[in-house]
């Protein structure tokens, strides 16, 4: 039965390598859909909304079959997003705006505060694998919800890790503060990580998450200067011409905010994604580590779609293929005071 098989796949979702192949019988889509609704406690306002979601679900099943057919090291399957069409998903659950250059401040220079760095030079010695999580330098996986705020989560995730490296202590900082107080990025309509860093410098710092909790919708700025927990001195945009330099930078300086095309990972369940195309950057994630499994080198990314997506909120993608277009935009990192 599907239900038994579905829970079996969930059980292996965090295995070190995804050897299981999933194939969904499209003719049984309605059975899968009913189980999906129960598993994820889905509610639809009207019968028409339910029917439209089923159309999306059925189309996504075909996408999962196609990805599983061409992927021998990753599993793609039903998850909590499977009733959303891909275009809507990117609009509601991603949020990178690569052409964002305007500002409410007419004197704003988008490169004024973040130093532009082309990383070159001879290769440095690095270990075969490295994971900042194992050093307790990465905070918990968070969930952006129906809000194009990935840019804020990637930026704050970078700052949290930089703080942990500097102070040997994990703290959770406020993404909501960026949604409300950042005058350059566009809140739930998207933004860029380096602009977020620059706005934090302008604002004066960032508060603890507990003092300025995430709402997933924009409100008036209610910043309390006395509660600022972390301040930044400056920030970097890295122009990385090859993945070896990115690996060295990650190992030397800590987790890095990067831009990707997320379309091919929406249905990701586990394993190493060896197919992740770049049809336009639309999402921001935090690069936290790298490794090798069964002779396949991979990156480890922290996402902001909750811990019940992917490998406990993370995904892995093959190295040295510019997976998901990860080298097509500047990587970014903050420097703390």
Swiss-Prot record:
Enzyme superclass (EC): hydrolase
Main function: Cysteine protease that plays an essential role in host liquefaction to facilitate horizontal transmission of the virus. May participate in the degradation of foreign protein expressed by the baculovirus system.
Family: Belongs to the peptidase C1 family.
Gene Ontology terms, MF aspect: cysteine-type peptidase activity
Enzyme Commission number: 3.4.22.50
Alphabetical keyword list: Disulfide bond, Hydrolase, Protease, Signal, Thiol protease, Zymogen
Cysteine disulfide links: 147-188, 181-221, 276-324
Residues forming the catalytic site: 150, 283, 303
Database matches in CDD domains: Peptidase_C1A
Protein name: Viral cathepsin
Organism of derivation: Spodoptera litura multicapsid nucleopolyhedrovirus (SpltMNPV)
Reactions that this protein is recorded to catalyse: Endopeptidase of broad specificity, hydrolyzing substrates of both cathepsin L and cathepsin B
